[in-house]
């Protein structure tokens, strides 16, 4: 339910990019945001994204579903798959802004008596980029995907790491 709210929320234009990257991470089996932002157009091969994870160097081949393709098409870059890195030297600045705006996204009220000052009420004040990975892992678990498969998808070698991603409150 919360994921649908995030996906369908009529966000301010500047914030939409961060919500889209969040959803794209979820659609691509919880891909790490750093790995996602560093993808190149050549990493799209035959309807799949093929890349090596930065942290582990493990190879991945992830099917690109229509929802993911729509986001990729909206934010397509030249040098990188997504345009956000075309003018940046490091993905961390984007990630920092993404996490800032994810926790703030929600209702915006404009106070005309105070020269149009905006007041933001965050819907999910604890929302961060990594929640896309957590949510993917949790939903996979709810759908009875074996924990070993979830661990492999997330690039985890140890089960205790994967368990920390899965919220058993949803089961």
Which residues make up each language-model segment?
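Basic, Lys/Arg- and aromatic-enriched nucleic-acid-binding interface segment
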Residues: 1-33, 37
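Feature representing long, continuous alpha-helical segments
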Residues: 4, 26, 34, 38, ...
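Short, basic (Lys/Arg/His-rich) helix/loop patches that form interaction surfaces
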Residues: 8-14, 99-152
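Short, contiguous acidic/charged loop-to-helix segments that flank catalytic cores in large enzymes
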Residues: 10-12, 50-60, 85-94, 120-131, ...
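Conserved tyrosine-mediated DNA breakage-rejoining catalytic core shared by Y-recombinases
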Residues: 28, 38-74
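Catalytic-site neighborhood detector that most strongly recognizes the C-terminal catalytic loop/helix
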Residues: 53-57, 154-171
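C-terminal catalytic core of Y-nucleophile DNA break-rejoin enzymes
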Residues: 56-73, 79-104
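C-terminal secondary-structure termini that scaffold catalytic or DNA-interacting sites
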Residues: 79, 85-90, 110-117, 160, ...
